[in-house]
Amino acid sequence: VGRVPGALAHTNVLGNALFGSISSSAIAASTAIGGVLIPQQVNEGYDRKFATAVNIASAPTGMVIPPSTAFIMYSLVAGGASISSLFLGGYLVGSLWALGIMVVAYVIAKRHNYPTVAKAKKGEVSKVLREAVPSVLLIVIIIGGILTGLFTAIEASAIAVAYSLLISMFYYKTVKINDLPKMLKEAVLMS
């Protein structure tokens, strides 16, 4: 999105959609994404009110984009409503919601001459993409497994934890064996 007017606003929308889809929390998404991108947008010359409005409007999109905890809970409470159908509907609604915000952000950014971001170098893009693939694959595994019926939503959560642990330990090397007791204790306390 680098050279598109309002590029940082579009990044905010996409970041909220992805973060929110994993966390199923608009508050967590808006805090995490907005906490990083709003100051950056202001430093780049965006109006703080515009940056905040984009963040607030886009934070809830992730709640309807699968894997959506709200849809999983609805399916359980409604007596087995099809999670696949709910997820497909969520993709459509969430994507249109995010796209709508991006169109409005584009028009406002163009009108106010908000700066674009310099085009990234080829080597930088490929490096970032290589680093992101294992994390993005988590979403594909969860959603693909549920939609194909390979596993249930509850089983998907266990698979997600195991996969996340494996890539954190062996690919990103950010978690060590010694960290596991503390992580397990925190997980128990949070649940």
Q: Which residues make up each language-model segment?
A:
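Alpha-helical transmembrane segments of multi-pass membrane transport proteins
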Residues: 1-191
